UniProtKB/Swiss-Prot annotation:
This is Phospho-N-acetylmuramoyl-pentapeptide-transferase. GO terms for molecular function: metal ion binding; phospho-N-acetylmuramoyl-pentapeptide-transferase activity; UDP-N-acetylmuramoyl-L-alanyl-D-glutamyl-meso-2,6-diaminopimelyl-D-alanyl-D-alanine:undecaprenyl-phosphate transferase activity. It comes from Bacteroides fragilis (strain ATCC 25285 / DSM 2151 / CCUG 4856 / JCM 11019 / LMG 10263 / NCTC 9343 / Onslow / VPI 2553 / EN-2). It is a multi-pass membrane protein. The lineage of its organism: Bacteria, Pseudomonadati, Bacteroidota, Bacteroidia, Bacteroidales. It is found in: Cell inner membrane. The gene is mraY. It comes from the Bacteria. Catalyzes the initial step of the lipid cycle reactions in the biosynthesis of the cell wall peptidoglycan: transfers peptidoglycan precursor phospho-MurNAc-pentapeptide from UDP-MurNAc-pentapeptide onto the lipid carrier undecaprenyl phosphate, yielding undecaprenyl-pyrophosphoryl-MurNAc-pentapeptide, known as lipid I. Pathway: Cell wall biogenesis; peptidoglycan biosynthesis. It catalyses: UDP-N-acetyl-alpha-D-muramoyl-L-alanyl-gamma-D-glutamyl-meso-2,6-diaminopimeloyl-D-alanyl-D-alanine + di-trans,octa-cis-undecaprenyl phosphate = di-trans,octa-cis-undecaprenyl diphospho-N-acetyl-alpha-D-muramoyl-L-alanyl-D-glutamyl-meso-2,6-diaminopimeloyl-D-alanyl-D-alanine + UMP. GO terms for biological process: cell division; cell wall organization; peptidoglycan biosynthetic process; regulation of cell shape.
């Protein structure tokens, strides 16, 4: 909104109004404003949650031996993150930009889904929350909206990066002069760092391009569902999900910035995406909101984000990566989320396989994997064998959290470095 006001003032030659035309200025303002909202207003909101007794519900110590220490801590703090993202974006962003619109829809959509889940848990006293099938329907619905919008909108285009052999030892990357609708995505180790989904369904002949878009929509649905659930599982320790997501957000912000700048895109040999500079505004608000929230969520947590926050930040990361055509980098960048997801799936599969044989067995002491590192064998169900019992030493949750942050930083660096590998 302020962008349009200052654009009008700039036409009237109002001093300083031209600053809002610079993406870097608006991005800096977005991160500062989001940080202030989440830290200052967040404190007031936490006190409101306490007064209304919107707190973590009692947990069964046999099921969750760590949760009993968290009872009474305010939950649904994800509202702080959502508000701290939306206000800067609405004030500083170009609200006609298709990418900004999609990110705002994602934030509100998954925020509402997570809010419904938390509401049922806290106010209806139902520990299961929103039924799993409704969560999946919500995530699939969002993936469908995002995928079809990127397919149908004429504003969603790229300029393809092309490698040109200038000499025997020198390759120059140039970009086409025409905007294209494309099913290409960025992936290391492929020619020009690009993979075209249409090539994967080349056997469809003249229908390959349409089939490529259908495949893209399916992958979009899968990525949105997987990453939002991964972030949800990662939110099991104080500061864990917020810290990891801020690091991932910073990396995506860098990728969005270079994708919106034709020279930087050429340096990294990735496609140029016109209009994606508005995503930098959004991701800066995202980072600022998470850092401000982390002020209260770091150990010992004064507030939990709940599913209101974790589903939202996971979905934001997924949709953002899809928009900038970097969704196939998610297994590297969001490696922590991937491992958390896999640990839960493998634990269930291994347990059920043993149950069919009449054996009590688990792959890890506890899942998701971050709980494995703080669980002693005494907390495992009596008579249950555990495949992986190491490490013998138990770690405090703050140490586990920081180490997971470090792993995410390393994965973020690898994500960017791989793009320079020819």
């Amino acid at each position: 909104m302020l962008y349009y006001l200052f654009e009008w003032l700039h036409k009237l030659n109002f001093p300083g109004a031209g600053m809002f035309g610079y993406t870097s200025f608006r991005a800096l303002m977005a991160i500062i404003l989001a940080l202030l909202i989440s830290s200052i207003w967040g404190d007031k909101f936490i006190n409101l949650l306490k007064r209304k007794q919107i707190t973590e519900t009692q947990r069964d110590a046999k099921i969750d031996p760590f949760g009993v220490n968290k009872v009474g801590v305010p939950s649904m703090g994800g509202v702080i993150i959502i508000v701290a993202i939306l206000i800067p974006c609405l004030l500083l962003g170009k609200l006609h930009n298709i990418y900004m619109i999609l990110m705002l829809i994602t934030t509100v959509w998954l925020g509402s889904l997570g809010f419904a889940d938390d509401y049922i848990k806290i106010f209806k006293k139902d520990k299961e929350g929103l039924h799993g099938k409704f969560k999946i329907i919500g995530q699939v619905g969002l993936g469908l909206i995002v995928g079809l919008t990127l397919y149908l909108s004429p504003d969603v285009v790229i300029r393809e990066n092309i490698e040109v052999q200038k000499s025997e030892n020198e390759i120059e990357v140039i970009h086409g002069t025409h905007d294209l609708k494309s099913t290409q995505t960025t992936i290391p180790f492929f020619k020009s760092n690009n993979l075209d989904y249409a090539d994967l369904v080349g056997f469809m002949g003249e229908h390959a391009q349409t089939a490529g878009w259908i495949l893209f929509v399916i992958i979009t649905i899968f990525v949105v569902t997987a990453v939002s659930n991964g972030a949800n599982l990662n939110d099991g320790m104080d500061g864990m999900a917020a810290g990891n997501s801020a690091i991932i957000g910073l990396t995506l912000g860098i990728l969005a910035y270079v994708s919106s700048h034709i020279e930087f895109a050429g340096y990294l040999n990735i496609m140029y995406i016109p209009g994606s500079e508005e995503l930098v505004i959004f991701i800066c608000a995202f980072i600022g909101a998470l850092i401000g929230f982390l002020w209260y969520n770091a150990y010992p947590a004064q507030v939990f984000m709940g599913d209101t926050g974790s589903l939202t930040i996971g979905g934001i990361i997924a949709v953002f990566a899809i928009i900038i055509h970097k969704e196939l980098l998610i297994p590297i960048l969001c490696g922590i989320f991937l491992v958390e997801n896999l640990s839960v799936l493998l634990q269930r599969f291994y347990y059920k396989a043993g149950k069919r044989k009449g054996i009590k067995q688990r792959l890890f002491k506890r899942a998701p994997i971050h709980d494995h590192f703080r669980t002693s064998m005494s907390l495992v169900e009596p008579g249950c064998s555990v495949k992986f019992t190491k490490p013998d030493q138990l770690f405090h949750e703050s140490k586990i959290t920081v180490r997971f942050w470090i792993v995410t930083i390393v994965l973020a660096a690898i994500t960017i470095i791989t793009l320079k590998i020819r």
